[in-house]
Amino acid sequence: DVIFHLAGISGFPACASNPHSAQLINVEATRLLRDSLSKNQRLINASTTSMYGKSGKHCDEETAVEPVSTYAHTKYAAEKILHDAENVVSLRFATVFGFSPKMRMDLMVNDFTYKAVKEKVLVLFDSFAKRTFMHVEDAADCYIFTMDHFDEMKGDIYNAGGNHLNYSKEEIANLIKDKIDYNIINSELKDKDLRHFIVNFDKIEKLGFVPKRTIQEGINELIKVYSFYEYFSHYKTI
């Protein structure tokens, strides 16, 4: 059996709104899952690059983590719980973008594009801040890749994404502006989300995984979808 551990409260806003639930679901439920595994079951854990924090530097899997949110803290705690378990791979995913049936609207590329299309204005906080991104279909492909290469990857942690997909907030906003006209306002106020880092994906790329979809392709897809897609925030119900 292969278990894809996707259960959890995901993202800065959702975890900040209910830290107790984030601890119970992201950390304690992971502990229960680990204790329930048989020796023959393989587990692929969905972790996050968010734990690299606000260093502003290039980060690989050996870089000391600096979690700056409840979300990042709980995901790192889950990683540590699984560290000594047999048959486990942890994937530190980039921020996902692109359309899906239950799309998260709080993710940066999805959110920025929605505001450009629907509101015609985007206010940027800490426009210099860098993040790393990955199309949702590439994220799914990464799970399949890891399943197919499990024996080679087990017992380790991998950044999941691509070296060509590190962008600043301002760069994302301008890529959207290349496709649709809207106003970008740079605010002097600080963002509550302090993340700022550049992620290195050499480790997983050397095994053969490289994301195929570009940011530009994702933006084009979202612009088309937002002509009929009704906004829903997944964490309002938490």
Region roles according to the model:
Residues 1-25:
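NAD(P)H-binding glycine-rich loop region in Rossmannoid oxidoreductase-like domains
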Residues 119-120, 124-238:
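C-terminal substrate-binding subdomain of Rossmann-fold SDR/epimerase-dehydratase oxidoreductases
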